[in-house]
Amino acid sequence: MKQLRYIALLIFIITACAAYSQRMYDRCGSMIGRYENGRIYDRTGCYVGRIESGRFYDHTGWYLGCENGDRYYDRSGTLVGYCSGKRYYDRTGYYIGSVENGYVYDRTGTRIGQYSKVPSQVVALVYLFELFELP
């Protein structure tokens, strides 16, 4: 279950155009994954999933969910969260964090991660740390 959550985390946090090569880091500066040409890799370089037209799949092709504008849905079509500007909320409207100047902050303002070369459409790491209850 934790592996599935980790894969889902990587799939959802790195949503952007295929032209970008992106890297995501945890609060300690360790790389947790990268996105390249529509494919997502974990920290060891293993392929874990892909993004096609706003839809997210794991490495086996299993559909995990999608984005539609600033809203994010799980595979059943249930809204799981949304963003407004640089602030992220769960499906109930509870504030869970923000993204600013390449850094990701939790709801208390504590920096929990960072990213590089990520365009503005990226889904915040903080949103997924909260959603998937990862440390």
Label every PLM stretch briefly.
Residues 2-6, 17-38, 43-46, 53, ...:
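Long terminal segments
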Residues 11-14:
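Repetitive helical segments and hydrophobic/amphipathic motifs
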